Amino acid sequence: MTNKIILSIQSAVIHGAVGNNAAMPIYQYLHQPAESVDTVQLAAHPGFGTNTLSVTPAAELGALLADYGKLDIFSQLGAIQTGYFGDHSQIAPVAEFIAASTQANEPIIYLLDPVLGDAGRLYVDGSILDAMRADLLPHADIITPNQFELTLLAETAIKNETDAVSAARQLITGRLRVVFATGIATASSQI
């Protein structure tokens, strides 16, 4: 995919390497053409105790994506990656853009990193989970949940590797072909 563009739609932070701050340097290092749009801005990962969250309004996010779709460069789009969303209202315009991009640029790959929470705790409002499950998951080719996020998306308890495989298989329908789950509890540790 070295000649196609990846569009990364996720968070930006002042300090740290999460969201677009993590993705873009990797793409640059790999000489992979990539562009980004930020869903939110934060001082740092919320785990650092920061509280200020500046959410890109859904209408603005939708307008930016619609304008991007009018650019000549849009025809070179090969993949879309999404991560953290600050409000459930952001998901509909992103889902619409993914659908339009898929129609205009077949084949396009959509990777959903469902940044929802970890270790049994949601980082986001539950309405984001609902919108993600309803509007983004059906468009995804690849998802990269941690164990907690896989539990939420599949709506099933995951206590071990066997449960994780079962949950992943439950989700693999329609476009979805790859579930790359992290932090799965095993008898000896985690995978």
Where are these regions (language model features)?
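Conserved N-terminal subdomain of the carbohydrate kinase-like
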Residues: 2-112, 116-119
